[in-house]
């Protein structure tokens, strides 16, 4: 499902939703445990899982960016700084698993925004596939499809 993108005050809110047939604690582990995190976003690792702690982003050029965790409610909310923006994962229990909501608060829409949103879109799909025991193939091909859709939505 494509993200819902709206302007709210002085920011843009990109909201992704996934209904997962897995318990919250399992989904939470995919967001916060480095061995699982590496399977869907290998450039990220949790350095210190607490409010004020950090997520480390490997820029793939020998440099690293420290992303400060601004809200942590174990098992339900993880929010951290993403450059000038914010990313937030929320988990809600459902009878057959959980509802994952991912929100990116964007201060502006740039030429890079569709790349970012396509990346998050694919990452969320990959989490779901991995939890369901599916093989992840052609990840970059999927990204290209979503990149085109987000480009059309935001920049045309």
What are these regions (language model features)?
Residues 1-44:
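Hydrophobic ligand-binding cavity/cleft-lining segments
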Residues 5-11, 49-51, 71-73, 92-96:
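Short, ordered beta-strand-loop transition motifs
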Residues 13-15, 54, 64, 99-101:
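Intrinsic-disorder/low-complexity, polar/charged segments enriched in Ser/Thr/Lys/Arg/Asp/Glu/Gln
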Residues 17-18, 67-71, 86-93:
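Hydrophobic/aromatic beta-strand elements that line small-molecule binding cavities or substrate pockets
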Residues 27, 37, 55, 69, ...:
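Hydrophobic pocket/interface hotspot
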Residues 38-84:
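Glycine-rich portal/gate segments that line the openings of hydrophobic small-molecule binding cavities
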Residues 79-131:
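Beta-strand/loop substructures that line and gate deep hydrophobic ligand-binding cavities in soluble
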Residues 131-156:
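Short, highly charged C-terminal tails/helix-capping segments
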């Amino acid at each position: 499902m494509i993200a819902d993108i709206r302007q709210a005050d002085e920011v843009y809110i990109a909201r992704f939703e996934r209904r997962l047939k897995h318990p919250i604690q399992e989904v939470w582990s995919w967001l916060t445990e480095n061995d699982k995190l590496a399977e869907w976003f290998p450039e990220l690792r949790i350095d210190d899982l607490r409010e004020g702690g950090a997520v480390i982003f490997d820029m793939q050029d020998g440099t690293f960016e420290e992303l400060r965790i601004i809200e942590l409610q174990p098992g339900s909310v993880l929010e951290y700084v993403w450059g000038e923006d914010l990313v937030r994962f929320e988990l809600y229990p459902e009878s057959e698993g959980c509802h994952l909501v991912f929100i990116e608060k964007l201060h502006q829409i740039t030429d890079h925004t569709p790349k970012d949103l396509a990346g998050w879109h694919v990452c969320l799909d990959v989490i779901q596939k991995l939890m369901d025991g599916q093989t992840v193939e052609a990840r970059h091909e999927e990204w290209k499809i979503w990149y085109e859709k987000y480009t059309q939505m935001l920049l045309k």
